[in-house]
Amino acid sequence: MYSSVSKRLVSVHILVVVALQLLFIPNVLSLNQTNAYLHHKCVNDQGTYNSGTPYEKNLNSLIRTISTLNLNFGFVHSSNGDAPNSVFIKLQCRGDSYFSKCRSCLATANSEIRRRCPKNKEKIIWYDNCVLEISSIDTFNKIDYQNNFFMYNAKDVSGDIELFNKNTRDLLHELKEKANIKSKKDFMYAAGEKGLGEKKLYAMVQCTKDLTPNNCNVCLNWIMAKLPKCCKGKQGGRVLSTSCNFRYELYPFLMI
């Protein structure tokens, strides 16, 4: 179902394997429960650490603390230790994947990213249900323009492609406005649908909850500008960074 491209072609072959697996997912419930691995990045800019060092001890302690939280709001930004051994963790779960699903995604993401990037101080991993970033630098309310990738549905749209692209843009921008309504329980997240004759277009947008509404707008506008490059004329697509993401499909993919 999916083909994929990333800014740095680190794990394209893995994404293609995931794409083929998604082709056989029988229903929406399975899609949400499988919590498919999407992508990861071992960042070298912040260097590495050794076993038994203060950085590793701070990281292990912070993970244990976060794992005890209820995660009812699907977001954590926390730190432990003082420079140069400070550790910062940011976890954002998808808007329909809070509570136990968020806790489960954290456990999976932490185990897998530390296996894939065992000694990198900065490492990021994306799953369907969450994104986990571990870093030695605080990224609170900062838009990450460096770490992003996109995936698209291999099936092309039939009919008027330009009209479909316009409807996709319109729905995503409508959801962007909804995501920034502070009174909403699911602030920084919005999902919806749009009728397209006999079909429906489903979409969602989300920002990490540490961003201000203005920065959320900036982030979503930035990734939405990638639509022509990533997903033009495709039945589905998504762009993900550590700060914000969107997805659209011609089938329901959320538990809403």
From Swiss-Prot:
UniProt KW Secreted keyword: yes
InterPro entries (UniProt xref): CRR_secretory_protein, GNK2, GNK2_sf
Gene Ontology CC terms: extracellular region
Signal peptide: 1-30
Compartments (UniProt record): Secreted
Ranges annotated as spanning the membrane: none
Gnk2-homologous domain boundaries: 37-139, 145-253
Full protein name: Putative cysteine-rich repeat secretory protein 21
Gene (UniProt): CRRSP21
